[in-house]
Amino acid sequence: AAIGLARQQAHHKQASTDTISPNTLTIGLEGTFAPFSYRQDGKLTGFEVDLSTAIAKKLDLKPKYVQTKWDSLIAGLGSKRYDVIFNDVGVTPERQQAYRFSTPYLYAKTVLIKRKNNTQLNSLADLKGKKMAQSTTSNFGVLAKKSGAEIVAVPGMTEAMNMVTTQRAD
């Protein structure tokens, strides 16, 4: 879900006065995870880039993207580094107390990603004592830790996948 914009936009002209920079919607995202947001030929692209661009246009604002590592993405919204986050953010009670969430634009299904030959990891119960590559602020990292996993901190999905393929995480 997109989070941010603490005030409802009554009409388009008011939108530019409710943003960090006039006439601009400053958007925080990772930009490292296809098909959501990623770089292709040096240009930021993806589903969340397209969606946030369309929303900015509807508000008569110019989109400005700020790529940020996941672990500091939500904190950046709190410190007014950007107006909104478009980055498949999970809704938690703690986040709901601090931020407004849009209607979900995506329902993601969570799965364990493991090496093809790993037949031991099939459920949360199987995580006990295993090394899991996760962002330190990930909802899934918290869940894995509660299930007894050892968390190997990584900045994002690309690094997590590398840890698994190089057998530095289960």
For the regions a language model picked out, list residue spans one by one.
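Flexible hinge/capping segments at coil-to-helix
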Residues: 115-132
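Extracytoplasmic small-molecule ligand-binding "clamshell" domains
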Residues: 17-88
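Short helix-initiation/N-cap motifs at beta->coil->alpha
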Residues: 65-75, 119, 137, 152-168
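Short, well-ordered beta-strand segments
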Residues: 26-28, 113, 131-133
